[in-house]
Amino acid sequence: MKIKSINVMNYRNIDGNSMILHPESNYLIGENNLGKSNFLFLLDTVCNGKTFDEKDFTNPEAPIEITLELQLLPNEIGFFGDNFSPHDPTTIKLRYLQKIDESCPTCINYDTGESIQIRQLKKIHYIKYDTNALPSRELRVDTQRGTGLLVSSIIDKYIENIPEEKTFLNSEQIENLTNYLNEHLNKIRSFKEYSIMATVADTPNEMLSRLYYLSDGVRKIDCTGSGVQFIAMATINVLCQIMNIYKSKSIVFEDHLYTDDNGKKILPIILSVDEPEVHLHPFLQRSLIRYYKQILQNKDNDFIELLKMCFGIDGLNGQLIVVTHSTDALVGDYRNLIRFYKTEEKTNIISGISLNLRDENEKHLLMHFPEIKEAFYAKCVILIEGQTEYGCIPSFAETLNISLDDLGISVINAGGEGTIKPLKCLLDAFAIPSISIYDGDVKNGKTSATDEFFTNELCFEIEVVKHLYANGQTSIVKQIVQELDSKGENVVLEANYLKKPFEKMGINIATYTPKKLSDVSESDTAEFCNMYSAWYMKKKGILLGRIIGQILTPEQIPSCYADAIKKAQEVAQNV
């Protein structure tokens, strides 16, 4: 069972929004305070048949109305009795309504209007892991919640399988210790007057549960680092919440399961995680998300063994929903993203799975996703063609006294002119404004749009050299060479080495005589610009870009780059 889509009316700050969910994993992204966590609270309320609070109503005069569409497997048909779509028995649309003065909500079949018992919604099995939970409570073994509940159940299984008499401690010594302890406690007046005494646990389970504590082999778990505690809590939480379903008396556990075509008993669940990046470094963030995906798809044999031992089931069929502000937690591609953004003080939502992008662009986008993840959190994106520009633009912005981070401006290296357009289409589809900077060799007489900028020369490297030369700053051109390679001026540049740059500039390499940069006269405009441009082009990369960015003053920055950065600033400030 998976959530296919949801429509929200009159709920907090996500009123009037709809979204389509990916059947496997979803990442809710966007700026703070736009309703991502509110969406998880909404699912928790609806999927567990809870009542809305007064604060949940956007307009107290109108009801909250949630339309939830579920996709069922053929083996799950009947989970909600005869309630399913008349057009497709594997889907069911639910309407969940409540007025502010009503004590409980109403749930009906969207297509037929038939009433559905609220308790039936618990079969959706929505599990919400909250990273604000305290490890000191959740990882204690001596309680009947969290880890304690799970450990207690495992001990029960062990005790059930012991054929002989279940004696774990020396009864005589325990009795002597109890008498000794109470003899001293009885000297306290209140203990004596009210018969308060130390009492041995009635059952082996109760006694054994208090015998253990979690540790890393050296220290108690509560003395380990926060990251260790939170990763332990995050991974054990799923089992603990399934244990709550298993022990619940409201619905028989067997009624929560379906049997697949191979005869295996499967529990469908929807798992949500709010900000898994809390206390976890990037590798652990990715590891945790991949672990969740593995257990929800039955790809972790150890976890399957635990499910079999604890609950008598063979696996899970799960859907993952993650709220995150971390690019490291985005394990997937753009189709897994659900972006929250604001227009005119209202939250809007775009689902990546609902986008219709051209097939020829999709391969580019899927391959580039790891490099462009930051862009989905941005207010504006600057798209550039190559690594040299990528290395210099942050420094250019700083030189112009423009803070990219404060404004939420992301710089993305498209890796070539041919990829800028597909990336721009993707960003447009997610309502993310972008500014594109192209090399002049692709302009071909085209009139620039307001969000497009072109170098005057064939490429960035030539633009920098000629711009500096035109302003009488040949010493800066040479300084950049010296910063990148202290011997760069004194190496003979052979024809084969300069062949490609010369071809790009339309220079006949056959007329070239090998020489050093130091042999080039500053008074020879053509030779100086051609030789240094060719050297820059051969050395292009992030390091060259950073050196250029750090050396140039505001007046020395080529105008197309300064103008593009200022345009991005304007756009970001008005989003």
Where do the PLM segments sit?
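Hydrophobic "anchor" residues on beta-strands that sit immediately upstream
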Residues: 27, 126, 270-273, 381, ...
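Acidic, Mg2+-coordinating catalytic modules of nucleic-acid enzymes
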Residues: 1, 49, 71, 85, ...
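Conserved P-loop NTP-binding catalytic core
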Residues: 38-87
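Glycine-rich phosphate-binding loops of NTPases
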Residues: 54-57, 74-168, 358
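Switch/communication elements of ASCE P-loop NTPase nucleotide-binding domains
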Residues: 1-48, 218-371, 570-571
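Conserved catalytic network of the ASCE P-loop NTPase/AAA+ motor domain
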Residues: 58-62, 119-122, 245-247, 261-265, ...
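Short glycine-/polar-rich loops that comprise or flank the Walker A/P-loop
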Residues: 61-68, 89-92, 121-126, 267, ...
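Extended helical coiled-coil dimerization/tether regions that scaffold
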Residues: 138-275
